[in-house]
Amino acid sequence: MLRRFLKGAGIKYTLGLTATPLKLQTNMGQDGRPFSKLVMLTSRSKKGIFFKKIIYVAQIQEMVESKFWSKLEYQSYDFNTGDLVYNTTGAEYSNSSIKKAYKNQKISSKIVKKVEELYDRRSILIAVPSIDEAKALTTLIPSCKAVYSDMPSQERKETLEEFKSGRLRCVAQVNILSVGFDYPELDCIITGRPTASLSWWYQFVGRVTRIHPNKSEGLVIDFVGAVPKFGKVEDI
């Protein structure tokens, strides 16, 4: 559709901008099993390449040094990956194994204890594997509410308004605020959701990279081995 529009309008040159030049693409192997690989923007389309060449790349470290991104600090803790198994796509761990690892390694208790220590943080966004786990945290952490996909839209809207206004300190979320949630004043994220996806890790850390006069840096708390697995996003 885009190609037809550009051709009909007589547009010869198109400039594309993206914050995520790398994406996971799932393909079928010769053995009949699906596999996933990271592909670049210029080569990832299954319908043919639209963008032909990358003409400029702004490295994340460059963005931090230029103060377009907030400075980041990391705290990463030991995590045993023994319970984790890949799902059928090979792109992510299975939901059941993610929940098993979360439970067996008592990540919920670790999150609660860490939040108690973070008395100097104004707002904390927490990623957990399931709705039940998110709701459980709301009973253990003061000023904490859960956000998930099938909650009433008005309730979700009001919860996020509370969070952004500072009336609510913590939000435990399940795969809904990891991408595209814009709250520049957010100064801390906690990941309690194991992941095999570099894209998810990059996007979630991105929630705390916005600059704001009221914060000096964004704090990333990692309970699931994401930093050892993927590294700091500034180094990607």
Question: Where are these predicted regions, by residue range?
Answer:
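Short glycine-/polar-rich loops that comprise or flank the Walker A/P-loop
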Residues: 10-13, 51-53, 69-72, 143, ...
